[in-house]
Amino acid sequence: AVFIQAQEAEDEEDESIFELSPFSIQEDESIGYQALSTLAGTRIKTALRDTGAAISVITPEFLEDIGAVDAASVLSYSLNTEVSGEQGNFAGGVETGDDRSNPAVNGQRVRGISPASLTRGYFLTDIPFDSYNTTRITINRGPNSLLFGVANPGGVINNQVKLATLGDNFGSVKFRFGERGGNRQELDVNGIIIPGRL
């Protein structure tokens, strides 16, 4: 038994150790207003130029520049979308047969057909999105997937929410004032709580 243990120890020493190169995943690949990749259409990270679907990606820079804070203000600037309400570009509603009556959810049409399915991280939601917690918005006009998926005939509007960034301290404060007494305040803070851990 001693001979076998000694032989195993020699075999372990003979094995060379391979050190792998660091592997990193970047959250967002965009340059200004131009997004380079998406999960929409295939559920696999794909370059936008290689997708066979009509997809628009609204980047954080574009959201900031147009002053968008909700779906209505984003869809007013998007391709092949219509939104009802004060900032809208169509009158009337679309009867979808469901019980939802929230205009922030139902007051939009994509491709002139019907409201798009709203998703957060590509999971269905009825929660309207807001710019304070949004990193990018992907509008997929038409069927949502290559093989399967959840979508209305109009398509999918996906909201990608902000996530905590480990190992980084940053923050921002925004104040916005508008006509007729409108105002909005935002506070966004990311900080290290326990150095090296959280």
Regions found by a protein language model. Give the residues of each.
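Short, acidic, small-residue-rich periplasmic hinge/interaction motif at the N-terminus
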Residues: 6-64
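Outer-membrane beta-barrel translocator/receptor signature
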Residues: 133-135, 141, 145-198
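Extracytoplasmic
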Residues: 15-22, 50-53, 58, 103-105, ...
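C-terminal segment of classical bacterial N-terminal signal peptides
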Residues: 1-5
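Flexible glycine-/small-residue-rich
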Residues: 22-29, 110-114, 141, 161-163
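Short, solvent-exposed loop/turn elements at domain surfaces
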Residues: 30-36, 118-119, 181-182
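Extracytoplasmic beta-strand/coil segments of soluble accessory domains associated
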Residues: 37-48, 52-56, 66, 70-128, ...
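Non-catalytic regulatory/gating segments with a bias toward low-complexity or hydrophobic composition
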Residues: 55, 63, 74-75, 137-142, ...
